[in-house]
Amino acid sequence: MNAEMAGRRAIKMVSEVVNFTVLLVVVLLLAYAFYSLWDSQQIYQAAEKSNYAIYKPTVENEGKTFKELQAINPEVIAWLSVYGTNIDYPLTQGQDNMKYVNTNAEGLYSLSGSIFLDYRNNKDFTDFNSIIYGHNMDKKAMFGEIDSFSDRRIFDTHQYGNLYFDGTDHSIEFFAFVHTDAYNSEILTPNVREEERQRYLDNLLAAATHKRAVNISTDDHIVLLVSCSSRSTNGRNILVGKVTDEINRVLSAQTDCIIVDQFSSNNENGSIMPIFLWHILLKLILALIITIRIYTIYHKQN
């Protein structure tokens, strides 16, 4: 009898240890899930264009607030806007192409990084082709809307932008959208030499998914807005525009872009839900199932 009772106590003790361990796992899963939500929210908040709105150069402030940002970080060289989108950010340039991958425009560490000009380009945009990079982020942050230009409707209704540098506004007229590989040196090489410009331009237009008729020559200056693609690991989406001294403040009538993030997947209705949120949701469901199981076992034993 004593042996039987001792056996039961041992089984109960083991069961309690198992239950406690499972409960601990549940708590850790919940803690991780909520931390992931908080952390991702912090990243997206840091990337919002509203964080830099006070620095945006305008006719009214004569660029004084922009100069204040340059005083904070001298590597801020310009301001880029794509009309009808949330792309409205200061533009930086480092001594390499790595610094501003995880540094914001104020020079502080940030996973959302900055929009930045290739270090091999001249900051006065006198090169034939200047390459500008930005993260493909959810919630229309940074270059999160470049991906949406693969939709012909979006491309057709978002034709203009603005590039402010050297104290002056310059118009951008977008004329091509290209999807290519990250290692395509025929397109992703900045500051092409004069004798190679026509071939470069021909290759660019031949690779374009969408394009419109714009007078463009080897004497012009073009910018390539480059971001990661949601379609492939090494894919790059590129919005190409011609920089002119003519100021065109025409806003696109279409402002509701269909955003596809590099970390997103489509459901049956075509809506977007980031994969990391699915992971968190599954962890929460698993934690709930385990908690119910522990509760059931505990009450059966008592």
Model regions and ranges:
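N-terminal hydrophobic alpha-helix used for membrane targeting or insertion
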Residues: 5-8, 124, 272
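N-terminal Lys/Arg-rich, disordered targeting/topogenic segments
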Residues: 1-15, 302
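Solvent-exposed, non-transmembrane regions of membrane-associated and secreted proteins
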Residues: 20, 27-265, 293
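Alpha-helical transmembrane segments
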Residues: 14-31, 279-297
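Intrinsically disordered, low-complexity regulatory regions
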Residues: 10-13, 43, 290
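Juxtamembrane/start-of-transmembrane alpha-helix segments at the extracytoplasmic/lumenal side
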Residues: 18, 257-284
